[in-house]
Amino acid sequence: MSKTQPIKPRMAQRATLSFGIVASQYNLAYVQAMADHAQNELNQLEPGASVALVWVPGSFEIPVAVKVMAAQRKFDAIIALGVVFQGETEHASLIANSVSMALQTVAMDHTVPVIHEVLLLKNEEQAKARCLGAELNRGIEAARAAVATARTIREILPRF
């Protein structure tokens, strides 16, 4: 696990951004913590930003909800949050691979940043370290990546 977080973007200087978060209800305690941290970080970095949080039953359902949000063209970036634990079978890997590919496809098809924090973890210890703490929380990382990428795209668009 990386011990460093992405650089915290500067405070907003102009029009606020709009963010979507799609979160899995499965392994709720971990995902809820990531969602809370992501929302708090988005509000700190982009005061007044619009943040829409949508819950889906499990990680496999995240991409379709992300696609619906992306198709609306109302969001500058969308964050996907979930926790999948590896078990004795290949099921978790199949879910993780499918979700990863689908999220990238949505991002490319709709030209919207999709920040992928659907975590494939070995155990609860890894989940606690990545989801519950404030120091290396993946929700915070997702929010920082969403803000930085959305701002970059806003800078690029007028040039072309």
Provide a role label for each language-model segment.
Residues 25, 29, 33, 49, ...:
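Residues at secondary-structure transition points
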Residues 65-103, 160:
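Glycine-rich phosphate-binding loop
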Residues 19-20, 50, 84-88, 124-129:
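Glycine/charged-rich beta-loop-alpha catalytic/anionic-binding loops adjacent to active sites
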